[in-house]
């Protein structure tokens, strides 16, 4: 696949606990989630530098891969295999990510269903991107919406959070069902 198996997004604010939330734990690091930004380039610096075309980049990547494979054969460190895999994924993302992130391809009806402004980061945008990722074979998608742990003004806090998440959450389930993807997708909503 041109996309990672495990993608993490947030609605723009920080994520309590940070990258430890999607780390691989006791599993090999190939199982670590890849954080996507909710707008623009999903991963910073994934584009080729100015003056580097796809052929030059492929040649460079092949050389680095050969050196990494040689080192992997010498030391047997599984982290080297992860590095090789990550480099290949980054190369593939350069072509697949722009199309994935372009929500202007969606119909006005779909954008309205989610309550999504395609130009602004939001929970709705993350849910619509999640649906597009499911269509493209991403197996695990984690969307964080911070701010639920209210210690004062609980009613105001939760009213705002519900307003930001309810429509898009329902739209995601409805849209997956409409596309015939809900029956092969497990949706968990938790806090």
Question: Which residues are covered by each model-predicted region?
Answer:
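Ligand-binding pockets and gating/stacking loops
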Residues: 1-191
